[in-house]
Amino acid sequence: ANDSSVRSLLNESSEARMNQAKQTAEFLKKQISEKGMIDVGTGVERELGISKEKMNQALYILEMEGYHIYGGGVPQVTNPGKQTNIKVLCPPGTEHKEIYNFENVHSVRDYVSHDDGETFDKFVYPKSMDSSRLKIRYAEDGGIQKDGVIEIRRGVDDLSLGDSHYAQVRILVDGNRYLKGMAVYSDDLPDGVDVMFNTNKKKGTPTSDVLKKVKDDPDNPFGSLIKAGGQSYYIDADGKRQLSLINKRAEEGDWGEWADKLPSQFLSKQSLSLVNKQLNLAASDKMAEFDEICSLTNPTVKKSLLKSFADDCDSAAVHLQAAALPRQKYQVILPITSMKDNEVYAPNYKNGETVALVRYPHGGTFEIPILKVNNKLAEGKSVLGNTPADAIGINKKNADRLSGADFDGDTVMVIPCNSTKSKVKITSTSPLKGLEGFDTKDAYGGTVKKDADGVDHYYRNGKEYKIMRNTQTEMGKVSNLITDMTLKGATQDELARAVRHSMVVIDAEKHKLDYKQSEIDNGIASLKKKYQGNVDSEGHYHEGASTLISRAKSETQVLKRKGSPTINEDGSLSYKSVKEEYVDKNGKIQVRTQKSTKMAETKDARTLSSGTPQEEAYADYANSMKSLANQARREMMSTGKIAYSASAKATYSEEVKSLNAKLDLALANAPRERQAQTMANATVAAKRKDNPDMTKAEVKKASQQALAQARSSVGAKRSNIEITDKEWEAIQAGAISENKLTQILNNTNTDTIRQRATPRASTALSTAKQNRIAALSASGYSTSEIAEALGVSSSTVSKYLNGKE
């Protein structure tokens, strides 16, 4: 072909390409005329079936015609401090700030959930039970022994717990009140009574005051999230489908899945030998994981895992969670009134062994009951069954010792210990005298009066007091105070004062207590001065967290950071800070900052320590995590990549095609997720406008619910890429570019990929794994438990423990 014919063909194809861009621009214009502002961020081109280049050309055409393209961030409603980036196409004349009216930002496609919403069970307004079916068991009749327990008649269709022996539930009563607590079956309810509610309130208290008042929110009448699938249906006598009265917040099996690390709040108050054992085990676990990642054969997979591993190590330095003790698990507590004071019904543990119970927030060793397991008790079997997934039964005396635990869904950490064969020794001391008989509601409860506008006001001793709105913040302060006092050797009387106040703080928002008076009565100000007061290098006096344990997660403000951090030669991270000024609501010029933690910002954890042995142990651990994070990043920087092979792409063309299709499907969720985030933001903003006094906890619940509903309505659902053996062959042969493989790794199950990329040749265990065996053994793990943790046989573990390998 001559030059002119080639030019002619090129012109035709470029004209066709330009036509496609023009058509896309016209389509987007039509969308704007119908909807207003539209999201044109990552993934929208896939929905339109065009390339990224075509999309960019179409947007350029529209910009030339006076349309605006603005970037911004949608705050992630359930992830404070994080945002989802958006790119919005706007009609001419639109100001940048208008994109932050999220209810006005629409999607190009009108999303509908393809599975008709089956992925998320939509919340239905609850069905109400008539109060004639309910009886209250007051304190004097034994209700105080089971406070918070809802006993329901077995075999009643509209009150079935399904496959569960127990569940944390909400039941609407008479349309305007509700019951909240732990539901269990009962076989001895009076005739005509289907539900018995146990309360610590005294006889004569009206039913309406025993029950909770329904919230004025049709999406969340209980002020608490009902779990996915927490509502169910049954077929009535007429063959009609009816909504059950039971609304589950959590059910049997949900509590046992919680993380089983050891928080510093508990471990730092135990013996130094136990602190060192569990921190060393946590460190050796991480070292073994690092060694395993370094042995991976695929460099792209290796880099991806090293990056997330380094982030995990940085996080571990801040959160200071040690390795779990053998068979340690969270369990929900239920009352067994016939249980002895030194016993526990715990079928997940061996009959006759001893266990420690730890509740969070944890005050100290005086709150830890050490109990003997008795799994032969008839009442235990009747209430919980023989095989409860994640519950134990204790009596009220032990619940009270656990800093006043309730039976309405409170959990404890159960740790087998202190028996003759156990290597685990948990320190438990006598209950503090100053806590005996202390009841937060009796001591600091008040009376409520409504004003002319229907607003509640709370009074105690004739004086009005304010209700707590920031439980988490206040709880954090008093927990840090107790930790600092314990490490610095406070007296039992001083600890009792702080713990009494912490008990009031825990209950203050829920039970409307006068927590400010508790602060005064317990002399909290003088305790803070004595145990947390310090003078800085410039001579300024401060109070606040004063030991490494409490300082690690303490908030600190840093200059606003832009973009991703760069990795220094030593593996540490450098951030680009910007000095942005703004005028606050008082007209003062302020510099924009963002939140970080003191541990994240220091290079040496010892700068946060006051010098106690426990703090020094934690400082060693934190520094080892920081060092390992840097080492992982250095390894990441020096790892190469698989060369892209065109011949491999041809050989594995079907696999490449399949992987591309799977990736397209996974990435197509991005616009839906952005739309869900903008919708949820708009919903929560409207709720906050209608209810300016919403607490942080209420906002969090509303956010979770709004996001779940928004994801359901637009069909946003993460789709994990499943990689076949043949597709993995294609990846290893270089048939997929590094950029595309990274995208695939971001949308697949990391553990499966790690297994595929781990070499199988050697049977000898790495030094890190051998060290981990030794550390697990020192912490009391059995041979079979160590074998399970490492994925090897018990005989292999025995050989290493006996020095035969």
Please describe what each predicted stretch is.
Residues 2-384, 391-404, 416-805:
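Beta-strand-enriched accessory nucleic-acid recognition/scaffold domains that flank the catalytic cores
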Residues 410-414:
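A short beta-strand element within the Helicase C-terminal
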